[in-house]
């Protein structure tokens, strides 16, 4: 009521404004975490197996577990953005407390964990490519994917403000780092996480196609179309993040995250049908 006293029943306390966003986020996160745990178990059993049949079984188990983990990991940041947007819509003070207040460092810890999941998933894919005879075509590209992933990961968990001591505050000249402070706001993080998703998807495409050769007559045109799709999408994500994130007002800054997500979804959903060379 007006005095702040809750007078509803148990269901009213549970089924509140953030019920659906939290459920969506938790379900997606649980699937991603479960797939990762099963994949880690399969990797351990694969390394310790003595028989070839056991190694083949756990290799198959790891492949399916990693597929499930990546399938849930790719939309997980979007589910988190949806939850955060609903929190701000419900209470701006709650959102400020979450992102810039007492819970801000929990967000940083969560960002580190999510980034570690992305890097681990990619590393699993690259190790799988090492056992594929046809992966030599893609091996030279892996180092560039790794550089982008690590760079995006560093931006992803860079904090905007710290809780410094007086001496640290004096040394920084304020609560924000003069060079890295710009990487701590959401436009940079939105751009970074979209790059994480796109390049993880690219690693998965290379992994799936390591032992496949395109035989259709339009393979060259198909490859060119795929490369153009990825290039145009990444350029669009960068422009939306940099220009609308730093050179326009707050309304456009927040709204730019939506076309970024749509761009990533278009890149991921449009199924490439030939092998990228």
Range-by-range predicted roles:
Residues 1-277:
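Polytopic transmembrane helical bundles with strong interfacial aromatic enrichment
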């Amino acid at each position: 009521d007006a005095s702040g006293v809750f007078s509803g029943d148990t269901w009213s306390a549970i089924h509140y404004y953030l019920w659906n966003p939290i459920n969506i986020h938790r379900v997606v996160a649980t699937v991603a975490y479960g797939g990762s745990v099963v994949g880690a178990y399969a990797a351990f059993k694969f390394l310790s197996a003595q028989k070839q049949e056991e190694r083949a079984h756990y290799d198959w188990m790891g492949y399916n577990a990693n597929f499930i983990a990546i399938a849930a990991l790719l939309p997980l940041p979007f589910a988190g953005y949806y939850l955060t947007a609903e929190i701000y819509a419900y209470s701006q003070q709650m959102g400020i407390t979450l992102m810039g207040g007492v819970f801000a460092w929990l967000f940083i810890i969560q960002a580190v964990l999510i980034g570690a999941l992305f890097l681990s998933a990619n590393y699993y894919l690259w190790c799988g490519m090492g056992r594929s005879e046809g992966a030599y075509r893609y091996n030279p590209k892996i180092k560039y994917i790794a550089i982008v992933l690590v760079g995006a990961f560093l931006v992803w968990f860079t904090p905007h403000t710290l809780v410094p001591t007086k001496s640290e505050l004096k040394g920084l000249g304020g609560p924000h780092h003069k060079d890295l402070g710009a990487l701590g706001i959401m436009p940079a993080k939105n751009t970074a996480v979209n790059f994480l998703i796109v390049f993880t998807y690219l690693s998965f495409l290379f992994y799936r196609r390591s032992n496949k050769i395109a035989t259709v007559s339009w393979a060259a045109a198909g490859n060119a179309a795929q490369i153009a799709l990825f290039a145009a999408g990444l350029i669009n994500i960068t422009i939306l993040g940099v220009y609308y994130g730093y050179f326009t007002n707050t309304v456009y800054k927040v709204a730019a995250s939506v076309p970024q997500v749509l761009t990533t979804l278009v890149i991921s959903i449009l199924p490439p049908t030939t092998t990228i060379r």
